[in-house]
Amino acid sequence: MWKRPDPQAKIKAGDRPQTCQSLALGSATESALPQALKLSDFQNFSVFEDISQHIKEVGAQLVKKVNAIFQLDITKDGKTILQWTIDLKNGAGDMYLGSARLPADTVFIIPDSVFTELVVGKINPQKAFLAGKFKVRGKVLLSQKLERIFREWAKI
């Protein structure tokens, strides 16, 4: 009678694989494996930590004023290297690593170096946007509220 192949069967060196078994094609090379992301290596990591702490302290007030979710896509060489979400719409406010859990009202696509200049106050956000230094998707007018939050944080 017909015998069903054992799906748990092992292939030993030199054996030919059975019908339902697959061949191991070798292991991935070192360069093909993704490198662990070290957040502290990014220029702006300490800035995000400070802003997150500020939101924890005064988040409830900010939620009343802002009522929006912002997603910051930080890029380097045209590729997104980091995403942060500032949720000032739900609960007492939150800032977390990763894309927005709920649909973001405004998404900023900002190069790492430009974001540093924005936060430090070297360049005006509106002028930088009009000059094409970063992109905004969604409700562009809400970006002015985020600018105020950064200014309040910078005063601390």
From Swiss-Prot:
Concerning PANTHER family, the annotation shows: SCP2 STEROL-BINDING DOMAIN-CONTAINING PROTEIN 1, STEROL CARRIER PROTEIN 2 SCP-2 FAMILY PROTEIN
Instruction: State the encoding gene.
Output: Scp2d1
Specify the superkingdom. Eukaryota
Extract the Pfam families matched here: SCP2 (PF02036)
Annotated SCP2 domain residues: 44-156
Protein name per Swiss-Prot or TrEMBL: SCP2 sterol-binding domain-containing protein 1
